């Protein structure tokens, strides 16, 4: 294996995890803040807001997991190495 390909794969794996975590992290913070505001304004809708929030968290976390899968593929099942 070429050292250049190995180094580029490790760098790409780190970037995949890092960049895949930034968007969902910001989105989850924003969603949680808006959910708290909604519950404060309308306490009787707490159950529905919480259910929707947890479902949206699951979808946001799936993006991070996809980044992790790409990083693991680059590290352990590298398609650029023969």
UniProtKB/Swiss-Prot annotation:
CDD domains in alphabetical order: ATP-synt_Fo_c_ATPH (cd18183)
GO cellular component: chloroplast thylakoid membrane; proton-transporting ATP synthase complex; proton-transporting two-sector ATPase complex, proton-transporting domain
Site for Reversibly protonated during proton transport, residues: 61
SUPFAM superfamilies: F1F0 ATP synthase subunit C
Record's keyword terms, sorted: ATP synthesis, CF(0), Chloroplast, Hydrogen ion transport, Ion transport, Lipid-binding, Membrane, Plastid, Thylakoid, Transmembrane, Transmembrane helix, Transport
Transmembrane domains' residue ranges: 3-23, 57-77
Keyword Transport tagged: yes
UniProt superkingdom: Eukaryota
Record keyword Thylakoid present: yes
Location in or out of the cell: Plastid, Chloroplast thylakoid membrane
InterPro entries per the UniProt record, alphabetical: ATP_synth_csu_bac/chlpt (IPR005953), ATP_synth_F0_csu (IPR000454), ATP_synth_F0_csu_DDCD_BS (IPR020537), ATP_synth_F0_csu_sf (IPR038662), ATPase_proteolipid_c-like_dom (IPR002379), F/V-ATP_Csub_sf (IPR035921)
Membrane topology value: Multi-pass membrane protein
Gene Ontology molecular function terms on file: lipid binding; proton-transporting ATP synthase activity, rotational mechanism
Homology family: Belongs to the ATPase C chain family.
Function: F(1)F(0) ATP synthase produces ATP from ADP in the presence of a proton or sodium gradient. F-type ATPases consist of two structural domains, F(1) containing the extramembraneous catalytic core and F(0) containing the membrane proton channel, linked together by a central stalk and a peripheral stalk. During catalysis, ATP synthesis in the catalytic domain of F(1) is coupled via a rotary mechanism of the central stalk subunits to proton translocation.
Quaternary organization: F-type ATPases have 2 components, F(1) - the catalytic core - and F(0) - the membrane proton channel. F(1) has five subunits: alpha(3), beta(3), gamma(1), delta(1), epsilon(1). F(0) has four main subunits: a(1), b(1), b'(1) and c(10-14). The alpha and beta chains form an alternating ring which encloses part of the gamma chain. F(1) is attached to F(0) by a central stalk formed by the gamma and epsilon chains, while a peripheral stalk is formed by the delta, b and b' chains.
Note from the entry: In plastids the F-type ATPase is also known as CF(1)CF(0).
UniProt xrefs under PANTHER family: ATP SYNTHASE LIPID-BINDING PROTEIN, MITOCHONDRIAL, ATP SYNTHASE SUBUNIT C, CHLOROPLASTIC
Protein name according to UniProt: ATP synthase subunit c, chloroplastic
Designated gene of the protein: atpH
């Amino acid at each position: 294996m070429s050292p250049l390909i190995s180094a580029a794969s490790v760098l790409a794996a780190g970037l995949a995890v890092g960049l895949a975590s930034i968007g969902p992290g910001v989105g989850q913070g924003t969603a949680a803040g808006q959910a708290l505001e909604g519950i404060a304004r309308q306490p009787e809708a707490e159950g529905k807001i919480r259910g929707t929030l947890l479902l949206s968290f699951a979808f946001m976390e799936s993006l991070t997991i996809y980044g992790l899968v790409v990083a693991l593929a680059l590290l352990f099942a590298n398609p650029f190495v023969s």
